[in-house]
């Protein structure tokens, strides 16, 4: 029998009160909570939950991700493994599930609904998951929900395969996550009426308010790529009485150097610091994801699993101890989640490229280019005079217009897709990556074809990774697992990433806060407005490839 007691100020989120208590834990469960007469320094509360994250974007395998985030009081995540599914299919999903089971940390996976993000007609991924694949996944007790349905056209037009995937979740009483950025109210209503119940893509408060009025649960996102907290946090007080049950917090995509400094606890601290109701904020961070996704995570009630955190500071929420299933997984600066190494899996069929492969020409007077936005995954479409790129159609550094290319890594000798992008800011050199949402082909951007070719070939040689270079220096972070993840510990991969990011900004000249993260979303054709994938420039608004 494993029996112990905790004495601390008990934060009762449900009844909105705090009082000193003695809490008894037996065999991983809360068996009693008793008020006591004492003056105590520590506070105890349920653990934090990230309500939507792609663990692969941290470059960490699930066990090493868990090792990192327990120090911030995170006890569970709602995780969509669609990044690795695009590369390795169901084998990739099983890799994530099996690795996650080697720790106490609670990761609740969904069945990816859109692999690839739209369909194989629009882009090339390493695998395709059809409705039968999804239905088989939904049968598993390891799958808790249907992951974000990004093919909004398929939902609105009632595409049979898309609707079948949604119904495979609903018929099993599992929830369906949404992904609906920039839709009109009319189309939003059609999209949500299919049975989809959440959205984490709101970037304006007006969009979020409308979706809340439809009964949609809004997940406020503050990650490494998209940062929407500043725009959406007023909802917390607006929704205090009417919609408090309808909000959650998430990181979505987060790099390890960001998570080193904080996770959901950092969002909680900001929200409380902005004056929002203390208990409402904690309800959003600790309670709402458990109730919505119906996951077995304790809420610090009698009979619950003993998943809780202890802190002395309820302003910053710096965590002193984290418990999961009654086991101490973090204390006094030390994570007790083991670091685990795995045999890599991958999917790479791409041979060395030549400079001639990156040549581009057009007879069009005006051509569309991508206009990227700092700290956002949406872009704008800009039309420019093609003479700005004449005569050789490389980059125009003076106008900050750079060549961008996608190289199919799954089907060798495919034609390279080429476009142009503004606001990236590189002055001399190139950066590249196999983290290229969501199909994860090779994406490169640079100031001339020679740099583009060199960056591409370094990535091909290593079968995946992140790369930045100029004439003097080349930096590569190897990502041997699907070209997405490393088996290195979080601190080591975070240090490598910080060095790479500093090189991109301070040496290559990019003005973006996180150039590689921004680059990775320039191929995501389900987020407005203009993106590029292995088949060409895609106008998300008109839902078609552009002739340029």
Curated annotation (Swiss-Prot):
GO terms for biological process: adenine catabolic process. Its cofactor is Mn(2+). Its EC number is 3.5.4.2. Transmembrane segments: none annotated. Keywords: Hydrolase, Manganese, Plasmid. Belongs to the metallo-dependent hydrolases superfamily. Adenine deaminase family. This is Adenine deaminase. It comes from Borreliella afzelii (strain PKo) (Borrelia afzelii). The gene is ade.
């Amino acid at each position: 029998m494993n029996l112990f007691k905790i004495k601390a100020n008990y934060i009762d989120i449900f009844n909105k009160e705090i009082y000193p208590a003695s809490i008894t834990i037996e065999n991983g469960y809360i068996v009693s909570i008793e008020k006591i007469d004492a003056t105590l320094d520590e506070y105890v509360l349920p653990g934090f939950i990230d309500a939507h994250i792609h663990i692969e974007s941290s470059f960490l395998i699930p066990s090493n991700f868990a090792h990192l985030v327990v120090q911030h009081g995170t006890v569970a995540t709602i995780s969509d493994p669609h990044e690795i599914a695009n590369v390795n299919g169901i084998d990739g999903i099983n890799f994530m599930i099996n690795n996650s089971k080697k720790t106490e940390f609670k990761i609740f996976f969904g069945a990816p609904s859109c692999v690839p993000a739209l369909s194989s007609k629009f882009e090339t991924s390493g695998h395709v998951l059809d409705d039968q694949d999804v239905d088989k996944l939904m049968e598993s007790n390891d799958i808790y929900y249907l992951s974000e349905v990004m093919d909004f056209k398929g939902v609105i037009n009632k595409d049979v395969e898309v609707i079948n995937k949604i119904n495979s979740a609903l018929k099993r009483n599992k929830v369906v996550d949404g992904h609906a950025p920039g839709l009109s109210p009319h189309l939003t209503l059609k999209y949500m009426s299919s049975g989809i119940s959440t959205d984490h893509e709101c970037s304006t408060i007006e969009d979020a308010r409308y979706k809340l009025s439809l009964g949609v649960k809004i997940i406020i996102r503050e990650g490494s790529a998209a940062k929407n907290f500043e725009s959406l946090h007023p909802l917390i007080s607006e929704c205090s009485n009417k919609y408090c049950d309808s909000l959650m917090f998430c990181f979505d995509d987060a790099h390890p150097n960001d998570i080193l400094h904080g996770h959901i606890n950092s969002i909680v601290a900001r929200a409380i610091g902005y004056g929002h109701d203390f208990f409402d904020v904690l309800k959003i961070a600790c309670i709402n994801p458990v109730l919505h996704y119906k996951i077995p995570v304790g809420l610090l009630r009698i009979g619950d699993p003993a998943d809780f955190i202890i802190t002395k500071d309820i302003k910053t929420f710096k965590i002193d101890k984290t418990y999961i299933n009654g086991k101490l997984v973090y204390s006094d600066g030390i994570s007790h989640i083991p670091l685990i190494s795995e045999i890599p899996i991958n999917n790479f069929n791409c041979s060395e490229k030549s400079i001639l492969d990156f040549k581009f020409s057009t007879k069009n007077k005006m051509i569309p280019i991508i206009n990227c936005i700092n700290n956002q995954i949406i872009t704008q479409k800009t039309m420019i005079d093609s003479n700005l790129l004449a005569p050789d159609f490389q980059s125009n550094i003076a106008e900050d217009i750079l060549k961008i290319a996608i190289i199919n890594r799954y089907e060798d000798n495919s034609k390279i897709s080429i476009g142009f992008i503004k606001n990236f800011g590189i002055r001399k050199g190139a950066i590249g990556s196999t983290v290229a949402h969501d199909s994860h082909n090779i994406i490169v951007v640079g100031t001339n074809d020679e740099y583009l070719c060199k960056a591409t070939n370094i990535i091909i040689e290593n079968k995946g990774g992140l790369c930045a270079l100029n004439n003097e220096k080349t930096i590569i972070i190897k990502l041997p697992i699907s070209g997405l993840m490393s088996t290195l510990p979080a601190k080591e991969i975070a240090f490598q990433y910080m060095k790479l990011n500093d090189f991109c900004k301070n040496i290559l000249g990019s003005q973006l806060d996180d150039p590689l993260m921004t680059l990775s979303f320039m191929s995501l054709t389900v987020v407005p407005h203009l993106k590029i994938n292995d088949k060409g420039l895609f106008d998300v608004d008109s839902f078609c490839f552009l002739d340029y």
